[in-house]
Amino acid sequence: IDSSSGALGNATYAAVGEVVPIISTAPVDAALRMKWLDRLFEAIQEDDPPYIEHLGDHWGDLCATSELASVWADQLVPTQRNVLRDRQRGNYAFFSGTTLCYSALFKAGRRDELLELLALDPRPIWQYLIWGARVLAARGQVDEAIAYVREHAGSTTRLETIARFAEDALLKVGRRAEAFDQYALLANQANSHLSTFRALAKKYPELAPDKLLGHLIASTPGEPGKWFATA
């Protein structure tokens, strides 16, 4: 059982981030990779508390090829459809392979099918609906992707989470001014004004410190003194 600080969960999350690129790029044949994935899938099913569930977000990358990802999608989609039918009937239904399914569909290039499944979910949580936004962003429909998460995100989704996605999507297509003006402050809020200022200065080096400071002061009326302390 994890401590109240969440140290074990944080360490496991970090470990997943380190392991995924190693497995994804390992020069092995499809048969061996499938054995690896079978073992990982079994581990995810038995993961309680769910320390390694984050692996599901990377399932497409772990498959390494679109062909293997499609094989996994074929295995996971039927169960996912059944779960969504139950949810539409108002029943509680959960499948620990949902993120794996969506990640595999994305990697396999089966983007329309992914959107179709998401449309069947009456209350998709952030970890699921983000895949629909990724599909739209990958198609170059950045504004639509941002609108998608704004429309479908539930009340439990923090505004900071939405802002981080929107900022990142805009930055990836070079729309830096919009990313900064509309989402940067909310997306990069840290535990102190100084930390927030430093994070923004690092991410937006094109902004002179005085201009950045002026924007932050204007964005938070009534708190100029707190920002001046960062200068």
Each predicted region: which residue ranges?
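Eukaryote-biased, non-catalytic alpha-solenoid scaffold regions
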Residues: 1-231
